Amino acid sequence: MISPNVETFIGCDSSYRAADIVLYGAPFDSTTSYRPGARFGPSAIRHESFGLETYSPYQNADLTDFDIFDSGDLELCFGSSEAALADIEARAAEILHDGKLPLLLGGEHLVTLGAVRAVAEKYPGLHIIHFDAHADLRDDYLGAKLSHACVLRRCHEIVGDGHIHQFCIRSGERAEFEFAAQHTEMHKFDFTGLAELTEQLCATKEPVYLTIDLDCLDPSASPAPVPPRPAA
């Protein structure tokens, strides 16, 4: 379970056997448009984490209070999106089989599909909470069904209507917003409704997958995502 290219995230000092949470990276950006580089995300996130503290005064919690294991990055095929997704799915399925929670670092947003496939197989009735500037609901992008611009559309094919909850969305084609009006729960521009949704899902104990694209943040706070979208 340990990849050879490990620079661990700060505070992830547990062994795999003892861990409740297993972090792993998917350094993949083969369908990225506008500007490549998301494949360097997992290693960069780990490296920069050592400039932080493990304790959060906002949460009054410390990463060292939790049993987290960082298993490093997958070695993914850059020539085949489906092969890369299969590897991501297999690792998530292995972690779930061992009774642990997978935590995935990307990588472009398409990597989410591999993990969602595994989690939805383990937990029927899965809900997806999605933070993003973009709807990611295109049926295809430049003829490709497996694209960062289509990932939530492919996820919808797995979890179905009413199980995708989107926040901060402020960019996409008209057709994506029309699709969302019929099939997803979209909250445009901000996080309005998130607290109520979280309370509802916790009360009913339904399974949840959280996926975060950093461009949900305003470029003033996070300028590097591709492409950046203002007015967050």
What role is predicted for each listed range?
Residues 1-232:
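Conserved alpha-helical scaffold segments that buttress catalytic/binding sites
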